[in-house]
Curated annotation (Swiss-Prot):
The chain crosses the membrane at residues 10-30, 33-53, 61-81, 92-112, 152-172. It catalyses: a plastoquinone + NADH + (n+1) H(+)(in) = a plastoquinol + NAD(+) + n H(+)(out); a plastoquinone + NADPH + (n+1) H(+)(in) = a plastoquinol + NADP(+) + n H(+)(out). The lineage of its organism: Eukaryota, Viridiplantae, Streptophyta, Embryophyta, Tracheophyta. The gene is ndhG. One of its GO terms (cellular component) is chloroplast thylakoid membrane. It is a multi-pass membrane protein. NDH shuttles electrons from NAD(P)H:plastoquinone, via FMN and iron-sulfur (Fe-S) centers, to quinones in the photosynthetic chain and possibly in a chloroplast respiratory chain. The immediate electron acceptor for the enzyme in this species is believed to be plastoquinone. Couples the redox reaction to proton translocation, and thus conserves the redox energy in a proton gradient. Keywords: Chloroplast, Membrane, NAD, NADP, Plastid, Plastoquinone, Quinone, Thylakoid, Translocase, Transmembrane, Transmembrane helix, Transport. One of its GO terms (molecular function) is quinone binding. InterPro entries: NAD(P)H-Q_Oxidoreduct_6 (IPR050290), NADH_UbQ/plastoQ_OxRdtase_su6 (IPR001457), Nuo/plastoQ_OxRdtase_6_NuoJ (IPR042106). NDH is composed of at least 16 different subunits, 5 of which are encoded in the nucleus. This is NAD(P)H-quinone oxidoreductase subunit 6, chloroplastic. Belongs to the complex I subunit 6 family. Its EC number is 7.1.1.-.
Length: 176
């Protein structure tokens, strides 16, 4: 979307705060159903970010795949599980929590040191800067691949780390 600067900045701040609040809801809400709905809200906010970046195909794929399929699957899985087992043997702090805290703190510190060095202005306006490269490409999927491997490399890696952590968490929950 080609919006004026102040409106674009307001929408970025609004969606960013929605992402932060939704992420906190995923982690802090005690009811898994509410956490799943909060995750759906986060995924919708991410797709709206893609719309602001003029990536309509990625936004549509985000909505269809993650919100429409994955989040609904999570909600069904949570609904079929026994709700009383979440509150049995509740320990406030375990060794795994300490290790997880150290790993997450390390990732957070590395991201805080990496993110200020990133040219975020260049990421937002890549559609204008890569016009010569895009003329040589034939399909939109090739353009998406080039952008993911050049301009959007850091956000793509952050998403892959988040998906890896989610996969490890799903395996840990499935073993219990």
């Amino acid at each position: 979307m080609n919006l004026p600067g102040p409106i674009h900045d307001f929408l970025l701040v609004f969606l960013g705060s929605g992402l932060i609040l939704g992420g906190l809801g995923v982690v802090l809400l005690p009811n898994p159903i509410y956490s799943a709905f909060s995750l759906g809200f986060v995924l919708v906010c991410i797709s709206l970010f893609y719309i602001l970046l003029n990536s309509y195909f990625v936004a549509a794929a985000q909505l269809l795949i993650y919100v429409g399929a994955i989040n609904v699957l999570i909600i069904f899985a949570v609904m079929f599980m026994n709700g009383s087992e979440y509150y049995k043997d509740f320990h406030l702090w375990t060794i795994g929590d300490g290790v997880t805290s150290v790993v997450c703190t390390g990732l957070f510190i590395s991201l805080i040191t990496t993110i200020p060095d990133m040219s975020w202005y260049g990421i937002i306006w890549t559609t204008k800067s890569n016009q010569i490269l895009e003329q040589d490409l034939i399909t939109n999927s090739q353009q998406i691949g080039v952008h993911l491997s050049t301009d959007f490399f850091l956000p793509f890696e952050l998403v892959s780390i988040i998906l890896l952590v989610a996969l490890i968490g799903a395996i840990a929950v499935a073993r219990q």
